[in-house]
């Protein structure tokens, strides 16, 4: 059975707390797993969440600050220790190549798994598969940072009443889907476009064009909200977003489910992030992330 969900492994920002691990997010997309921003302690969080190294197919790093990348060393070594039977692909800013190599080879271990490095150097597609296209967009942060967007190809939804009106039943339904027409009836006449699902991952950044482009029409948006609104100046100075800013991005982009995360340790009440997001006018589904939370990708409309 296909599963599309986000598994939150960690939600802290610069430093972990007693209740929050450094960043880490696994997107399950049918039979594939994409690990985003594995911070320190991600390998242990994977164990707690029931995520195996075998579940991973891609690793996407937004930038090389420690809370988004220090877990790479342990995760990569675990992939090799467990002899994952498939290739792993890693995406990260090309400008951080030296950091990736230091983390990949932080200590001695036996390499048993092919890990393909596909660094990001500009906006655009990184991978095109039958299941999705993975794109990157530049963000605005003191070090080079990219956000990621996964887009499923549009499909077709067959309309039973139109099929019946044209007398198309049984195996003929498959034939018209495959061939595009049947007996003078075009596929467009008996079906409609089923928009593919869209997922966006936006970490450390100020407001910028890339944030809006990544979020546009997303079914599920995972976005940093390091600061509360009263600290907006501090957020901008350090290259981050507030809860209200993140919520307005989601509101204006038509996001269906907003996940706020990457919280500063200075705040004791995480629910205030949710209250400020609602006050900013976001009316869709909202999750203030906690470690080990699972968030399903919203069902297709």
Curated annotation (Swiss-Prot):
Zn(2+) 1 binds at residues 63, 65, 141, 204. InterPro entries: Metallo-B-lactamas (IPR001279), RibonucZ/Hydroxyglut_hydro (IPR036866), RNase_Z/BN (IPR013471). Homodimer. Zinc phosphodiesterase, which displays some tRNA 3'-processing endonuclease activity. Probably involved in tRNA maturation, by removing a 3'-trailer from precursor tRNA. Keywords: Endonuclease, Hydrolase, Metal-binding, Nuclease, tRNA processing, Zinc. Pfam families: Lactamase_B (PF00753), Lactamase_B_2 (PF12706). This is Ribonuclease Z. Its cofactor is Zn(2+). The active site is at 67 (proton acceptor). GO terms for molecular function: 3'-tRNA processing endoribonuclease activity; zinc ion binding. SUPFAM superfamilies: Metallo-hydrolase/oxidoreductase. It catalyses: Endonucleolytic cleavage of RNA, removing extra 3' nucleotides from tRNA precursor, generating 3' termini of tRNAs. A 3'-hydroxy group is left at the tRNA terminus and a 5'-phosphoryl group is left at the trailer molecule. Its EC number is 3.1.26.11. The keyword Nucleotide-binding does not apply. Zn(2+) 2 binds at residues 67-68, 204, 262. Belongs to the RNase Z family. Binds 2 Zn(2+) ions. PANTHER family: ZINC PHOSPHODIESTERASE ELAC PROTEIN 1.
């Amino acid at each position: 059975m296909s599963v599309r969900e986000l598994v939150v492994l960690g939600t802290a920002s610069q430093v972990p707390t007693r209740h929050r691990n450094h960043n880490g997010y696994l997107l399950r997309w049918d039979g594939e797993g994409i690990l985003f921003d594995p911070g320190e302690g991600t390998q242990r969080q994977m164990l707690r969440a029931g995520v195996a190294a075998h579940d991973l197919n891609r690793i996407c790093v937004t930038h090389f600050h420690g809370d988004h990348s220090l877990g790479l060393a342990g995760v990569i070594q675990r992939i090799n220790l467990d002899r994952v039977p498939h290739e792993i692909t890693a995406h990260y800013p090309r400008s951080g190549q030296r950091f990736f190599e230091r983390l990949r080879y932080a200590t001695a271990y036996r390499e048993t798994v092919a890990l393909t490095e596909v660094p990001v150097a500009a906006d655009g597609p990184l991978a095109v598969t039958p299941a999705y296209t993975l794109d990157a967009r530049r963000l605005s942060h003191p070090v080079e940072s990219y956000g990621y967007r996964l887009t499923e190809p549009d499909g077709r939804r067959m309309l039973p009443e139109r099929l019946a009106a044209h007398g198309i039943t049984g195996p003929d339904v498959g034939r018209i889907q495959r061939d595009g027409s049947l007996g003078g009836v075009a596929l467009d006449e008996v079906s409609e476009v089923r928009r593919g699902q869209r997922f966006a991952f936006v970490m450390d950044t100020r407001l910028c064009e890339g944030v809006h482009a990544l979020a546009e029409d997303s079914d599920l948006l995972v976005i940093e909200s390091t600061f509360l609104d009263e600290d907006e100046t501090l957020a901008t100075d350090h290259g981050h977003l507030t809860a209200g800013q993140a919520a307005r991005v989601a509101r204006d982009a038509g996001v269906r489910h907003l996940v706020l995360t990457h919280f500063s340790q200075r705040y004791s009440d995480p629910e205030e992030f949710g209250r400020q997001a609602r006050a900013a006018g976001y009316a869709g589904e909202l999750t203030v992330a906690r470690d080990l939370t699972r968030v399903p990708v919203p069902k297709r409309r």
